[in-house]
Amino acid sequence: MEIRYSALRLDGDAQVEADAARDTFWELPPGAESDDAVFDKQMWVQTVMYRWGICGYTAYVSNGDVGSGERAAASVFFAPPSYFPGSLAMPSGPVSGDAILISNVFVDQPYMGLYLEHSLIDTVVTEAERRGIVAVEAFGRNDADTPEGSYFPEGYHGWEERPHSGDLEGAPVLSADILEQQGFEIIGKHPRFPRYRKDLNSAASLFSDFEADTHALLNNSAPLSTVLGGQWA
């Protein structure tokens, strides 16, 4: 099995994990509903890339056989908190003004257990450090008090139903365990949905092993295209 990481681009929705491509919990204000979630997510990605820069990465998995192709197995999104109005619904917010927010790592179920959440978070941290960002924050789901019989996989991304009216149990939120393993510390306390922070230029996590040239390669240094304003650039 081979795993390849790449920054999101604007030349096809195959670049995003399937559930990530249609989930807009973080990208819309609390209580807002989307008539076309896939389109809204695409426009969000285009807008953020045009105004701020790279805002996501995808992990592609293949079996290594020639001609077998690869699949978008996991995707992560990150940006300044103003681009994630859905974060206002989180009880341990708001996100600090000097930090960017990782909204979630969406992992396709067959690929859970490959530590894609960890490696994608490390990729975001590397990119944030490269851009001189002070800190990265994320909201976590604390499953320590989960009722017996309930089950949320590590990379749970709310496939059951998009939450309404303050019900966050179906929200796409990272596991608190993953964030703690990645060196994040609680900055906003809450029994169920604490907010975590990682100040940058600290010790690398167990999964971090990116050289500068390798990171530049996965960032796809070619010029970005956009359809904002009805024109390609």
Identify the role of each PLM range:
Residues 130-134, 141-189:
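Conserved active-site alpha-helix within GNAT-family acetyltransferase domains
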Residues 1-30:
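Conserved N-terminal entry element of GNAT/NAT acetyltransferase domains
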Residues 58-60, 77, 195-199:
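Short, well-ordered beta-strand micro-motif
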Residues 171-232:
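C-terminal "cap" of GNAT-fold acetyltransferases
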Residues 107, 112-129, 137:
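Conserved acetyl-CoA-binding loop-helix of GNAT-fold acetyltransferases
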Residues 46-51, 65-105, 147-153, 159, ...:
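Conserved acyl-donor/pantetheine-binding loop and adjacent beta-alpha core of acyl/acetyltransferases
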